Amino acid sequence: AACAARESNGIGSMRFKSAAHSRSSFARGVAGTRASRPSARYGTVAHAYADADGVGAAFEGDIGAERKHLILVDGLSFVFRAYYGWSARGDGLQNAAGEDTGVLYSYANTICSLLELRPTHLAVCFDAKGKTFRHEMFVEYKANRPPTPEPLLDVIPKVENLVRDMGVPLLRLSGVEADDIIGTMTRRAADDGFHVSIVSPDKDFYQLLSPRVRMLRPSKTNKGDPFEPFTVEDFRVMHDHAIEPKQFVDFLALVGDSSDNIPGVEGVGPKTALPLLERYGDIETILANAATVKGKRARESLLSEKGAASAVLSRRLVEIRQNLTVPSLNEPFLPLDDLRVKPPADRGLAAMRAFERYELANAAERWKRVVRL
């Protein structure tokens, strides 16, 4: 049976040359914790918990009066990103017990960076184990992906525990993907007057962009801000103002997506899809007028039963659901107020214990500044 989980306690780049160095660095870093004071660098953001209603300059000042900003994190994407940036290279962080800790270090910094934006609401969304409704529609969905490496399978539960220790709500629902949770919470929040930031590198979220919804994509450099905003206007420029974000579902349905094994329509690539959508608007209208499509190969493919069926199936696969419910309860997935940022129930000490276990001195120091221990 499908079930929802909301798990919470409230709410760089460095290397250690050896585990011994890591351990001694941590001991120095956490000494005198309560006496520490925020550095000048963090002086403007150290009150992220104490003043959780503030949103700072998260949207360049255009939501300051509304004071409602929800950040939703595509949880697994950052686990993979951190893993292939650290542990998979074989030269990442380890603690004295020999545990790889680079992913945990990276994830802790990501959470701290997001809290420093001073959102009013925050959650990390993960996929549940098992197949989803998309696999029921198309058994080959994501079948081209290699198996998840064993070390990565080992670190995912540790990341989830760290998120909980940092007091951030962790969301998952069996039978659907994290994308659908993000889509549902985004739609609900935007309808309720929030501004929403979706933290992910995944282009599938383009379809959710609106004046109230942007993406925060990982920065391509290690300098400056860790995230790069991607807005509706950025999307329009990327696609030569030919389509709007809501049409991106139809675009992917036409061209396919090899990363998720979405078939698309044979003979229709990006250079063909954009003019089609600019002229006809959506898949349904394109198929209804397939005989008038310019270009013999695309026209014949769209007129064929196989091509039309593939277009319809592909659209259903790439569309992010925005209306999830909990079937067993027959009610909306989760109240937005459950995602409100608030001081950790234990004043941040569970996270400090985790940092001590994994010997992440720098992460501990940053956490102290954010939570004001």
What annotation goes with each model-predicted range?
Residues 93-94, 143-328:
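Extended two-metal-dependent nuclease catalytic cores across DNA- and RNA-processing enzymes
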Residues 97-100, 149, 266, 276, ...:
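Hydrophobic alpha-helical scaffolding
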Residues 47-69, 316-373:
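Low-complexity, acidic/Ser/Thr- and charged residue-rich accessory regions of DNA metabolism proteins
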Residues 49-169:
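Domain-level signal for Mg2+-assisted phosphodiester chemistry and nucleotide/NA-binding surfaces
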Residues 30, 38-52:
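N-terminal mitochondrial targeting presequences
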Residues 120, 271, 361:
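Short acidic/polar active-site loop segments enriched in Thr and Asp
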